[in-house]
């Protein structure tokens, strides 16, 4: 699979986000500029990596839940940064990140193919 190393980058980024947010609350996220900047930066990396992987692997959108939304979120963070809501980012950390990590882990365990 051509995108195996890219998926590994996504997995590492998911682990980094988990580390950044471990033991943190939404109030912490709102009050810590460095945490917000770090989390948003890693989400940009995930979105860009998945954009590249999607170009290499047809069918990736069939096995990664919300692939288009993840890529779209990256675009909002980069181009629409002034409208990014803390609650939206935190909701993605809590609800969507674990799903993405699980699905990427499964793809990597299967050799990366959709």
Residue positions per predicted region:
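Solvent-exposed interaction patches of small proteins and small membrane subunits
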Residues: 1-114
């Amino acid at each position: 699979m051509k995108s195996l190393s890219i998926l590994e980058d996504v997995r590492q980024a998911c682990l980094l986000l988990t580390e950044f947010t471990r033991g943190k609350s939404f109030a912490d996220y709102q009050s810590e500029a460095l945490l917000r900047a770090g989390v948003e930066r890693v989400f940009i990396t995930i979105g860009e990596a998945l954009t590249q992987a999607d170009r290499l692997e047809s069918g990736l959108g069939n096995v990664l839940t919300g692939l288009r939304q993840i890529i779209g979120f990256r675009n909002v963070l980069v181009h629409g940064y002034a409208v990014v809501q803390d609650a939206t980012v935190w909701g993605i950390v809590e609800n969507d990140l674990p799903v993405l990590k699980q699905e990427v882990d499964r793809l990597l365990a299967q050799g990366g193919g959709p």
